[in-house]
Every structure is written in structure tokens, then in C-alpha cells.
């Protein structure tokens, strides 16, 4: 077990503060399947992703309707614009992570779950169950949005993510990889147990930088891909809207986020935190 010792000064005296990394989550834990807390967490992920898709898809549709110049009195400058859409996505993530962090960890994104799995923060069983719940919630959330505003949903694209005209698939894939890297790197940094042990205010503030990361990435990548960085967010509307273009581009919104999440997990855990070096040192000391 890795151990860091920090010296803190208080009234001219030095005292040692020991910190131990929490044990890594097991790859497969059969006992976890018998615990209600696992299923409660999956339900929380389902509901959170449902609400996330419902609000954000309706925000996109509302913006497109308000800026539709075919409607008398509308101009291209009407509506919330890209800034408003980015705020809707970032704001909802902030709210939902805050609400569900103590129950499920507040992933609301298969890419985040995948990154945390690679970082040994969650087991394979929990990761798979979360991803299923997130995708199911996304489908239901997009379905609710269509149910409430069916005509506008069909007319304005249903919040589906596709590669924008003028950009090739390679550029779109790169945008998704980098955008997801920013998000997952922020998640690892905001939930770092060492920082949480040192600064008691960090866990309370964690939803804020995560939501703000989502906001900033949307500002940068909405013009390119519509911003996925969340496979469930792209999958749900694609299932409900069922458009050929959405399915043709769908792989970008899975491969990009998973690659970005993997790179972020490796960078944080094995370079910044030096987990590989610590593990090697522990192995040598035990030998």
C-alpha cells in the first residue's frame, strides 16, 4: 500500500499526516450482486441520465425552433444559442452529480464509468450495470422529450449528434477524444482521495469543476460534432429519432469518448499519481 507523509505546521510545531491510498476495486466481485446498494446506485444512474437527456434535448429543440427563420418573426440570433446549450449541459451535470454522488458516484456517462473502471475505482460488474442503466435512461429521456413535443422533435432533429458539414470523421473523432479527456481528467482530479483527505472542502465542490468542464467542452465542440463526450447522450436520441445519418456517425461517439477516457485514466493514475512506480516500489520492498 502506497503511503505519503506530509508535514503540516501548526503553532510552530510539525506533525505528520499519514495518507494511505484506498484499495483498488476488485475486477469481479460476485458478492456485490447480492447487495441492494449496487441496484440502488444503478437506479440512480438511470434516473439521472433520463433527466439529463430530457432537459438537454428539449433545450436543443427549443433553440432550433426559436432560431428557425422560416417561422415569421424569428431571426437566426433568437434563442439561447451555443452558449445556452452549453450551460444546459454543464448545469445539468453539476446538479445531477451533486444529487447522486453519494449514491452512485454520479457518473451519468459510460465514458466516465469506463475511465473509473480502468483506474480501479469501480468493479467490472458495477461498470457494466452502470453503462446499461445509463443507456436505458438516455433512451427513456429522449423518448420523454419526443412524447412531450413530438412535432418539434421530428422537425428539428431530435437532439441527435452528427458530424457537422465541413468537418471530416477524423476531425470529429479527435474532438471527441480530446473533449472526453478533459472531462474524465477533471473527474479524476476532483475526486482524488488524496486531495479529499487533505482538503475537506474538495468533495463538496467536486460537482462544480465537473459541470464546468462539460460546459467548456461544449463551447469548443458543438460546431464540430454537436458534442458527444457521453456515449449514452448520443445513443438515446439516435435510438428514438432513428435517422441514417445518426447511425452512420454513431461509432465516433463511442470510440472517441472511450479512447479519451482511457488516456485520461492512464495519465492521472500512472503518470500524475505514479501508481505504477508505487506498485513497483511496494513489490520490491515486499521482496
Curated annotation (Swiss-Prot):
Functional note: Aquaporins facilitate the transport of water and small neutral solutes across cell membranes.
UniProt region (Disordered), positions on chain: 1-25
Entry text on domains: Aquaporins contain two tandem repeats each containing three membrane-spanning domains and a pore-forming loop with the signature motif Asn-Pro-Ala (NPA).
Membrane-spanning residues: 41-61, 79-99, 128-148, 170-190, 202-222, 252-272
Pfam families, sorted: MIP
Superkingdom of the organism of origin: Eukaryota
Membrane association type: Multi-pass membrane protein
Descriptive protein name: Aquaporin PIP2-7
Motif NPA 2, residue range(s) on this chain: 230-232
CDD domains: MIP
Amino acid at each position: 500500500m502506497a503511503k505519503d507523509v506530509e508535514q503540516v505546521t501548526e503553532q510552530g510545531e510539525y506533525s505528520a499526516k499519514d495518507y494511505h491510498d484506498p484499495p483498488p476495486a476488485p475486477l469481479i466481485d460476485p458478492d456485490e450482486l447480492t447487495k441492494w446498494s449496487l441496484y440502488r446506485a444503478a437506479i440512480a444512474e438511470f434516473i439521472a441520465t433520463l433527466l439529463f437527456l430530457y432537459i438537454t434535448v428539449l433545450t436543443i429543440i427549443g433553440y432550433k425552433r426559436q432560431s428557425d427563420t422560416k417561422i415569421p418573426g424569428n431571426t437566426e440570433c433568437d434563442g439561447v444559442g451555443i452558449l445556452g446549450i452549453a450551460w444546459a449541459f454543464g448545469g445539468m451535470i453539476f446538479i445531477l452529480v451533486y444529487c447522486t454522488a453519494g449514491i452512485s458516484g454520479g457518473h451519468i456517462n459510460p465514458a466516465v464509468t469506463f475511465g473509473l473502471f480502468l483506474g480501479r475505482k469501480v468493479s467490472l460488474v458495477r461498470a457494466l450495470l452502470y453503462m446499461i442503466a445509463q443507456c436505458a435512461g438516455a433512451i427513456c429521456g429522449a423518448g420523454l422529450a419526443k412524447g412531450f413535443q413530438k412535432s418539434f422533435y421530428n422537425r428539428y432533429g431530435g437532439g441527435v449528434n452528427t458530424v457537422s458539414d465541413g468537418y471530416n470523421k477524423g476531425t470529429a473523432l479527435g474532438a471527441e477524444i480530446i473533449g472526453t479527456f478533459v472531462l474524465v481528467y477533471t473527474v479524476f482530479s476532483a475526486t482524488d482521495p488524496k486531495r479529499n483527505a487533505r482538503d475537506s472542502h474538495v468533495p463538496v465542490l467536486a460537482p462544480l469543476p465537473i459541470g464546468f468542464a462539460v460546459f467548456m467542452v461544449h463551447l469548443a465542440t458543438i460546431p464540430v460534432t454537436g458534442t458527444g463526450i457521453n456515449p449514452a447522450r448520443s445513443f438515446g436520441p439516435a435510438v428514438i429519432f432513428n435517422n441514417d445519418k445518426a447511425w452512420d456517425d454513431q461509432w465516433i461517439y463511442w470510440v472517441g469518448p472511450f479512447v479519451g477516457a482511457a488516456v485520461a485514466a492512464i495519465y492521472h493514475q500512472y503518470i500524475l499519481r505514479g501508481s505504477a512506480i508505487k506498485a513497483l516500489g511496494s513489490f520490491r520492498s515486499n521482496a
